[in-house]
A protein has these predicted regions:
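Compositionally biased, intrinsically disordered low-complexity segments enriched in polar/Pro/Gly
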Residues: 1-7, 61, 66-68, 106-109, ...
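Small/polar-rich, solvent-exposed N-terminal microdomains that initiate assembly or binding
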Residues: 1-62, 85-86
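Hydrophobic beta-strand residues in large extracellular and virion-surface proteins
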Residues: 12, 16-20, 31-33, 48-50, ...
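Short, surface-exposed loop and linker segments with low hydrophobicity and enrichment for Pro/Ser/Thr
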Residues: 41-43, 64-70, 111-116
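Short, surface-exposed linear patches
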Residues: 55-57, 70-74, 96-101
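"Short basic amphipathic alpha-helical interaction patches in structured regions
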Residues: 64-65, 89-94
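Oligomerization/assembly interface segments of phage tail-like spikes and tubes
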Residues: 67-82, 117-130
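Acidic-leaning, charged glycine-interspersed low-complexity segments
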Residues: 92-134
Length: 134
């Protein structure tokens, strides 16, 4: 029973992934949204990789056996071939998604290497155990 009380913290990454995938696929035709940083076969462009790079516990009570809230940090990496404006448009959609869910967005970086453009940023917020992102 105690394990079930805190399982939401481990499921949260998948919840955000599913919501982001639906949102991005409605905004950008043909985008691949994934949690896996490795894939077999030919690369697909554009691709959005979402990874939860950690979380800290927040809102501890005196007994400390139940996780009341967490502050997860997600790193979003978008890759695309083509014009800089296109990857910026895709990044703006992704940032808009996170802002609509009350995340703080930081560390936006744009790079290019061998004709592949990359946009990376992080998103973080405190989320309570009984909050609903949808």
């Amino acid at each position: 029973m105690e394990n079930e009380l805190n399982s939401w913290t481990l499921d949260f990454e998948d919840t955000v992934y599913r919501l982001l995938k639906v949102y991005m696929e409605s905004k950008e035709s043909g985008i691949k949204v994934t949690q896996d940083d490795e894939s077999n076969g030919t690369p697909v462009f554009p691709t959005l990789l979402i990874q939860q790079i950690g979380f800290t516990e927040a809102g501890r009570d005196t007994e400390s056996y139940f996780i009341n809230a967490i502050r997860p940090t997600f790193q979003i990496t978008i890759t695309n071939k083509g014009k800089r404006e296109k990857i910026k448009d895709i990044a703006e959609y992704a940032v808009s998604f996170f802002k609509s869910k009350n995340f703080d967005v930081s560390n936006a970086v744009f790079t290019v290497s061998k004709q592949v453009r990359t946009a990376t940023f992080r998103a973080s917020r405190i989320i309570g155990a009984y909050e609903n992102l949808a």
